[in-house]
Amino acid sequence: MLDQRIKTNWLSLALPVFISLILLSWGIISKRKLLIIPGFILFGLSSAFFVIFQRLVYYKTFTLLFAAIGIFSFSWLLLFVFLAVIRKTTAWWALFVAAISGAVSLNFLISKQTLLTFIFSISLAIGIVFLLWGTRKRAIGLLIPGLLVSTIGAGVFFAWNDPVEKNGLQQTGTMLMWFALGWILIAVISKIFSRKFTWWPLIPGGVLTMVGAGLYIGGNPDNALGFFQNTGSIGLIMFGVYLILLKYGMKNK
């Protein structure tokens, strides 16, 4: 009624935002989890809805989507921070939502969005949260999905993102090599969290490496020399990282 009388065209949209801020303030002051969580969720949803449908400023649709989903992501990030500070609890589920929605929002800044860019950004976001969680808990069981999800997303993106490249064998080989990298990194990083080197991830990593290398070279034999030079350099770097981790593990014994 008031919105129709003063003809603001935004008051009705802003009302849920005001309600969420009141709910948030009440929850923060009282330190009640049952008010903080719905307060932040309502704030994120209502703010995103307001940004998309408001008529105060006019921007391109993709810009509005970036801002709306970005605010939604930021609200979940604030929820994660406030629960950690006020309630002394680490709500990793909130960080997952924040990271995934943030990754989606960033895609709307790209001039050309494709399914592959969404897959890459979302998988990278999920992987980073798992890696942070696993590092915080010092749990290899959380690092495994983090490394695998990240490298799988990267493999799909870098293998199939080039519209000019039409060599299916070579692209499949590239994808499998990225998959293999995830398993190999699990074996390398495991030295930080355990006193012994975890060998079993090298089995799927080695199989995927051989199959991927065979497909990559079979797709274009002219790339064989450059391929072995690059993989040799990467192998030396990973061996150096392993030696550093080995020394680090010995110091902690």
Region locations from a protein language model:
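Alpha-helical transmembrane segments and their membrane-interface anchoring/capping motifs
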Residues: 1-253
